[in-house]
Amino acid sequence: MNYTLETADRALGAFPALLGAAFAHDSLFAAHMWVLFFTLVVSTLLLLRRVSFLPPVAGPPCRRTEYFDEVVKYGVMATVFWGVVGFLVGVVVALQLAFPDLNIAPYFNFGRMRPLHTSAVIFAFGGNALIATSFYVVQRTCRARLFGGNLGWFVFWGYNLFIIMAATGYLLGITQGREYAEPEWYVDLWLTIVWVAYLATFLGTILTRKEPHISVANWFYLSFIVTIAMLHIVNNLAVPVSFLGVKSYSAFSGVQAALTQWWYGHNAVGFFLTAGFLGMMYYFIPKQVNRPVYSYRLSIIHFWALIFMYIWAGPHHLHYTALPDWAQTLGMVFSIMLWMPSWGGMINGLMTLSGAWDKIRTDPIVRMMVMAVAFYGMATFEGPMMSIKAVNSLSHYTDWTIGHVHSGALGWNGMITFGAIYYLTPKLWGRDRLYSLQLVNWHFWLATLGIVVYAAVMWVAGIQQALMWREYDSQGFLVYSFAESVAALFPYYVMRALGGLMFLSGALIMAYNVTMTILGHQREEGASKGAAPSLQPAE
């Protein structure tokens, strides 16, 4: 591969970015176009180092039957990088809440850093993990090379360009004000193009498969890709004020805008953070423990029940609002129904270890994956419980919800991703094993303790917060002002930052471990604690 076409594409793309910066109708659009221009110029210069202008050397025809793993390698590295960045920004945001003087206006205040954190963790860390693992899994389970040639490269680089544009936009103050859908219209259009290419690559690989059976992991990955495309397009329907400006107006307003937003927001959780990562679970846990999926029939029931029910659950985010009561109740009912298929999937994941339970003790990667499934079960019980109106009246708008989200995002999505990265890295780079399994063990305990501290503190803080808000005296006046309720949360916010710092420390250990594995180093280690002793001849 001589990278000539890829280099030309980036060089040509820099030209319209330069024109956009020159003729922009507002300073924010001009600044964003300069960011795009310099990003494309730097990537062009980096690729120029690998371009070969020599004619191809005659030789035997190149075989294109091997798996296309180079893009998966880059996906793994991007996942690790964005994970560390996202967790670091999360710790900064947590400290800003505890110590407001750390807010640096205008670019690094809480209002701009918070969406940077959520997008970095969900879309940069989680999205790159999903793209990398889906490209790896679909090739192995279909026994076919990734479809589309260099289309896989376009998906990877195009998606990461979206991440850069979205992140810099947040710091500049460019936002639609829609949670998890903050990027403005032109960034949304770019993501749509990339996502269609992603769908074509993944679906094309399935259609050209040499394996007659389609793995259940691919069903979950495909549902995530298709549904996210639908959600993204509908929720981001907007009319730009100018094609050379950042501002746009949504196609929806009022309660319709709220319902569309949380139809998107909840199903981003349901399909981006659940269905896609279940694809990981159904492939990597059986591979790591060397056992088949416990019940393939249960996995199919899990899939179709999840697909049918999740899409209806969004209105539970809008209890006690202007949304019609029947819609709120509908969202609550489907949320409660979701508990059954979710726990069916959890049981299926855990029972896959049947006959290999000892690996929880001896293999820290398996331990990490099992902990992920346990957090999946906990989060999918807590979510339906919080959707019940009586419970929601206490939990809504409080830090309890923040604790719930992080127990799922860090415990489920984070842990299963870490396990997948530890599985993939030695295989992709042809190493015998990871640099250090003891470091994996350290990562596991730091991450687990960090999540437990974070979630438990937020549960307590949220309940205290809610009870202070609804405390009335005998005359019907509020006992506590809002400022008093905020001041009471200070020790909890410090503890939350500590939990986040522990989780970040684990991610830094992972980054070091993965880097050393890629470089080909191996740390000399004795048997890990808890490992079964080797058999000795009878005396």
Swiss-Prot record:
SUPFAM superfamilies: Cytochrome c oxidase subunit I-like (SSF81442). It catalyses: 4 Fe(II)-[cytochrome c] + O2 + 8 H(+)(in) = 4 Fe(III)-[cytochrome c] + 2 H2O + 4 H(+)(out). Pfam families: COX1. It is a multi-pass membrane protein. Signal peptide: none annotated. GO terms for cellular component: plasma membrane. Gene3D superfamilies: Cytochrome c oxidase-like, subunit I domain (1.20.210.10). Heme b 2; high-spin binds at H404. Its EC number is 7.1.1.9. Disulfide bonds: none annotated. Its cofactor is Cu(2+); heme b. GO terms for molecular function: cytochrome-c oxidase activity; heme binding; metal ion binding. It is found in: Cell membrane. One of its GO terms (biological process) is electron transport coupled proton transport. InterPro entries: Cyt_c_oxase-like_su1_dom (IPR023616), Cyt_c_oxase-like_su1_sf (IPR036927), Cyt_C_Oxase_1 (IPR000883), Cyt_c_Oxase_su1_BS (IPR023615), Cyt_c_oxidase_cbb3_su1 (IPR004677). Cu cation binds at H266, H316, H317. The chain crosses the membrane at residues 28-48, 75-95, 118-138, 154-174, 187-207, 214-234, 265-285, 298-318, 330-350, 368-388, 402-422, 443-463, 498-518. Pathway: Energy metabolism; oxidative phosphorylation. Heme b 1; low-spin binds at H117, H406. It comes from the Bacteria. Keywords: Cell membrane, Copper, Electron transport, Heme, Iron, Membrane, Metal-binding, Respiratory chain, Translocase, Transmembrane, Transmembrane helix, Transport. Its main location: membrane. Cytochrome c oxidase is the component of the respiratory chain that catalyzes the reduction of oxygen to water. Subunits 1-3 form the functional core of the enzyme complex. Co I is the catalytic subunit of the enzyme. Electrons originating in cytochrome c or a quinol are transferred to the bimetallic center formed by a high-spin heme and copper B. Belongs to the heme-copper respiratory oxidase family. This is Cytochrome c oxidase subunit 1 homolog. It comes from Agrobacterium tumefaciens (strain T37).
